[in-house]
């Protein structure tokens, strides 16, 4: 009886401690006088996530609620994690660029011991991130992009051949799937040196696992929220985010690719070559003069994985959304086609690396697509030390606090981009761009932790779109969704039921 009473008292005490702890968490901003929206006990301000709204819409609603306030940031509960939700562009610039040294970390969950594929450049923090970023920076120079360019064009030419075969048989095509197959074949070739053949093989393995990697999770929304809110505890508990079949597939592919290349002394001037070269360097000298070891096999695996996933989803989605807008705006499409023809003619009918730089209007189309359809909705940062917002002494970001910069919401702010839901490439003319802060456009982030692969992603999308528009005319049809319906279960900007367009040869 006494033991039961003691256990009951212990349980009551633990419950009281837990209740107090959660109460302190959920009143975090109230106690500091920071504007916020009352959170759900468990889901915080993410209550509608995967029910009726995707994360883009949740962030957009929160941003719109406080957009005209004078607050540089407001409170947002990412599940139970209180985050500083940035409203002011000047604060965004301070965090991303001027005071980057205090905000270089992201605070995202990863577990290099139990889930090595998760310890990639996108997730890592501190000295690990800095070291890896320095090691990999040389792999994405313009010179390296020029070496990969012929490979991308070769895949793009095969894409055109497949399209010419498909169009006479069926003029209405689901365009998102087609551009996804193109990007999978490009990245499979450039990252792994493997002919994926997804353009012709309906059941291509790389395409299947590329899509599943973005959908299949080991845990549901609540456990993923727990890992996000308590990353250190989740790591100590040995929690893993990557689904086992995804882990097994990429581990096998990377291990086999490295083994074959090293045994046969194969050189392809691609991303995998660069990773193997870094792996085999016992010592390497960084730009700052530090001498460090090369990459481990686990680091090679993680970087190859994130290169594939990031390049596949962002490039294919951007191309799909661009074609959708060009189909709805035939005058813009005609202008792009005329520019492509003119530029190729200037280069003696050769689609050279220099051509992509001369396609000024096409680049504006891509920039506007990335604004209107921002694939990843936000940038994550975490404060290393207590930070008083310049000019706002009552707004303090505490050490260890998460920061959310809602890039997609910023891209749809009418005070920055008038009529933000209209597709207007002229916004990115040199004249209009000069009138906006650089941090008003953040599809690749900004500052020292911007997207390391942005050059490759842009090159791939430019080549694919230029050749598609040169060879085909895209228009809307009865199956074209208007407006687009987004998938609430997708973290990246995903469309339900695809994008159907009418396609004709030019």
Curated annotation (Swiss-Prot):
Instruction: Mention one GO molecular function.
Output: medium-chain fatty acid omega-1 hydroxylase activity
The enzyme class is: oxidoreductase
What PROSITE patterns does its record include?
CYTOCHROME_P450 (PS00086)
What cofactor requirement does the entry state? heme
Q: Quick check: keyword Kinase in the entry? A: no
Question: Which Gene Ontology biological process is one annotated for this entry?
Answer: lauric acid metabolic process
Supply the EC number(s).
1.14.-.-
Q: Where in the cell is it found?
A: Endoplasmic reticulum membrane; Microsome membrane
Tell me the membrane topology, using the record's own terms.
Answer: Peripheral membrane protein
Q: Which SUPFAM superfamilies does the entry mention?
A: Cytochrome P450 (SSF48264)
Q: Name one Pfam family in it.
A: p450
Listed binding positions for heme are 451
GO CC, alphabetical: endomembrane system; endoplasmic reticulum membrane
Question: Which controlled-vocabulary keywords does the entry list?
Answer: Endoplasmic reticulum, Heme, Iron, Membrane, Metal-binding, Microsome, Monooxygenase, Oxidoreductase
* Family, similarity comment: Belongs to the cytochrome P450 family.
Q: What does this protein do?
A: Involved in the metabolism of insect hormones and in the breakdown of synthetic insecticides.
- Protein name per the record: Cytochrome P450 6a8
* Organism the protein comes from: Drosophila melanogaster (Fruit fly)
Gene responsible for this protein = Cyp6a8
């Amino acid at each position: 009886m006494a033991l039961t009473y003691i256990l009951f008292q212990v349980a009551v005490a633990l419950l009281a401690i837990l209740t107090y702890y959660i109460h302190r968490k959920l009143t975090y901003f109230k106690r500091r006088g920071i504007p916020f929206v009352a959170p759900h006990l468990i889901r915080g301000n993410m209550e509608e996530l995967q029910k009726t709204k995707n994360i883009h819409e949740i962030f957009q609603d929160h941003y719109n609620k406080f957009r005209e306030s004078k607050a540089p940031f407001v409170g947002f509960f990412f599940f139970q994690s209180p985050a500083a939700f940035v409203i002011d562009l000047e604060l965004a610039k301070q965090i991303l660029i001027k005071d980057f040294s205090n905000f270089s970390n992201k605070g995202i969950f990863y577990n290099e011991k139990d889930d090595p594929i998760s310890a990639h450049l996108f997730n890592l923090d501190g000295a690990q991130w800095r070291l890896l970023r320095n090691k990999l920076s040389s792999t994405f120079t313009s010179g390296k992009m020029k070496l990969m360019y012929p490979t991308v064009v070769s895949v793009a030419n095969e894409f055109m051949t497949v399209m010419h075969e498909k169009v006479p048989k069926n003029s209405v095509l689901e365009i998102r799937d087609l551009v996804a197959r193109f990007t999978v074949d490009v990245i499979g070739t450039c990252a792994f040196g493997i002919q994926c053949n997804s353009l012709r093989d309906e059941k291509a393995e790389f395409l299947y696992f590329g899509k599943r990697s973005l959908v299949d999770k080991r845990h549901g929304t609540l456990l993923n929220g727990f890992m996000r809110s308590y990353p250190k505890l989740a790591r100590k508990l040995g929690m893993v985010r990557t689904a086992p079949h995804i882990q097994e597939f990429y581990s096998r592919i990377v291990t086999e690719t490295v083994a074959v290349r090293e045994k046969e002394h194969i050189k392809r001037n691609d991303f995998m070559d660069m990773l193997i070269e870094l792996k085999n360097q016992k010592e390497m000298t960084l730009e700052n003069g530090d001498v460090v070891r090369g990459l481990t096999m686990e680091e090679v695996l993680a970087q190859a994985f994130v290169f594939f996933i990031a390049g596949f989803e962002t490039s294919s989605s951007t191309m799909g959304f661009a074609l959708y807008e060009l189909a709805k705006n035939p005058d813009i499409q005609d202008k792009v086609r005329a520019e492509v023809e003119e530029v190729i003619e200037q280069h003696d009918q050769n689609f050279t690396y220099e051509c992509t730089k001369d396609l000024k209007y096409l680049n504006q189309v891509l920039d506007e697509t990335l604004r209107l359809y921002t694939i990843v909705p936000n940038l994550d940062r975490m404060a290393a030390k207590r930070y008083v917002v310049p000019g706002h002494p009552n707004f303090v970001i505490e050490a260890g606090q998460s920061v959310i910069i809602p890039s997609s919401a910023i891209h749809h702010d009418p005070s920055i981009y008038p009529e933000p839901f209209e597709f207007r490439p002229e916004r990115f003319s040199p004249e209009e761009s000069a009138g906006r802060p650089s941090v008003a456009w953040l599809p690749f982030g900004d500052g020292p932790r911007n997207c390391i692969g942005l050059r490759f992603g842009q090159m791939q999308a430019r080549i694919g779109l230029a050749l598609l528009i040169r060879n085909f005319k895209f228009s809307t049809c009865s199956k074209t969704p208007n407006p687009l319906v987004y998938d609430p279960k997708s973290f990246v900007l995903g469309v339900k039921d695809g994008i159907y367009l009418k396609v004709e040869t030019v």
